């Protein structure tokens, strides 16, 4: 094997390990306007550590998160998606979080059918006063995704 080919071979065979070593998961968070978004705001005001790679999308209700948006986020490069809403029984729109829970269950099944680990999707109930809990949930989810590695779907698609 020539020196140039050897270097190229080493580069290619070690690239995956190198990338995962410094892997910072990209997480998209769909946060309920009435509870979870306010918890994120409170976490920031209290200087609670949250993943720097968390991209927040404010939605009026967790029950209004379109499954197509979740799938699109994963296909376009998100390593994980968090849907966070009010605790059951506390929804500003009465039953929105129950809709979210049903959609979440179906979405997880769909992801598994497509060959993607459904643990890349998380549903959490976080009230407006739970800034610390917001930090805990997002950091635990980021660690879970970090252990899973990069989203394999983003490598297979070219959107």
Feature map (PLM): residue ranges:
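Iron-sulfur-associated redox domains of electron-transfer enzymes in respiratory
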Residues: 2-159
């Amino acid at each position: 094997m020539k020196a140039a080919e050897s270097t190229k071979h080493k580069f290619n065979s070690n690239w995956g390990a190198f990338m995962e070593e410094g892997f910072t998961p990209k997480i998209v968070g769909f946060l309920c306007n009435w509870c979870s978004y306010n918890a994120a705001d409170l976490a920031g005001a209290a200087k609670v550590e949250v993943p720097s790679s968390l991209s927040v999308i404010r939605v009026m209700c967790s029950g209004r998160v379109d499954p197509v948006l979740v799938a699109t986020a994963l296909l376009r490069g998100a390593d994980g998606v968090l849907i966070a809403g009010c605790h059951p029984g506390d929804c500003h729109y009465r039953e929105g979080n129950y809709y979210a829970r049903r959609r979440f269950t179906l979405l997880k099944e769909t992801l598994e059918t497509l060959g993607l680990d459904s643990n890349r999707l998380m549903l959490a109930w976080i009230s407006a006063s739970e800034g610390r809990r917001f930090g805990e949930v997002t950091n635990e989810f980021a660690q879970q995704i970090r252990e899973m590695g990069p989203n394999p779907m983003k490598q297979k698609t070219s959107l």
